[in-house]
Amino acid sequence: MALLDSATLEFVRSHADEDVRRLAFLADRFPGVDMPAALDQIRGRQVAKVKIPAWAAVDGIVYPPHLSLEQCSGEAAARYKARLVRRLGVQSMVDLTGGMGVDFSWMAREVGQATYVERQEWLCALAKENFPRLGLSHVEVRQGEAEALLPALPVVDFIYLDPARRDSKGGKTYAISDCVPDVSQLKEELLRHARWILVKLSPMLDWHAAVEAMRCGLGGVCEVHVVSSGNECKELLLLLSADAPVAPRLYCVNDDVCFSCDTRCAFPPLVYGVPRVGDMLLVPNASVMKAGCFTAFASRFRLRAIAPNSHLFFIPAEEASGDGFATGMPARCFRLVAVTSFNKKALRQALAGVSRANVAVRNFPLTAAELRKRLRLGDGGDVFIFATTTSERQHVLLVCRKLPDAGKIHENQP
């Protein structure tokens, strides 16, 4: 891959925050500039400012085309993997699917010996250009296929893989066996080269099925990490080891909040009820929802559920020690200001003075849009309405206000 010449680099620096669509029409005015390459870099840096701001802050980073940026991890997810590497006490590592190198760049900072492997030559060239600028002078870059290079690689503490999830036609794939490389087939060879294997998979996968796919032969999954950012599920991570237990430990991560549980435990059944005014309503975050560990979640925080399929929980006012009780909770937390049936008089009283609201439905016969129209409410504002069905099959509206977020590591987070 040809790196940028000085004229193109200067153009990129001078126009870093401008609209690339407008800049594309200026090519004739800058004959000495490689305009397609310049636009790729400007667009790449603009994406990086949002997705990987620490990279965007470093002058001279060379960015790949849009698809590689789309597929790479965000900074929050990369930092999480680095914390995991630190917790495991890793001293040496290999990334067998280096790609743009975002995950590698954070994990490599935690170890004394790190090797980046990538099958595409141009991405290796980018890595060799970028890693020194990121302060990674102790890393090695190797070009080649993971399966071909693996037998010749030294034994290390930790191997990381982010298998390609696109088929030969560019379409997205999700199943482990459809990804390249197929980690389920490589697992035993990988575990002969490392104590720990971390695999990044699509958040669309069911984690139970992913664990089952890794169960045959030597080793298996010892930890499952469901990673979200901004309450949007981004990644499913499987940590494999040769001595994995029968059932893995589950980590549900959203930004700086982590909830974990042992999937071998039998938790008490959910206790159902209807909340009252003043109670705290909790909506599990995206990672808990994806993991489906509702009985563990409710048991840990002594929560009641509204119904089996609502995934709405509450804490009686007398058991919640003020708004600070929500600190570090793996959920969005609300204070109930009204609980009402669909009786017209009750609705008028509950919604008095409310002209706009954020409306959501859970286990309810109407869509949010249909309900908002029926209630004659605009969208938005600081009032939240959850329409749901109780365990006794009664339709209720829960009118509430959101409690302040207090992002904080709650427990056991790497």
Kindly give the residue locations of the regions a language model identified.
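SAM-dependent transferase fold signal centered on methyltransferase-like domains
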Residues: 1-414
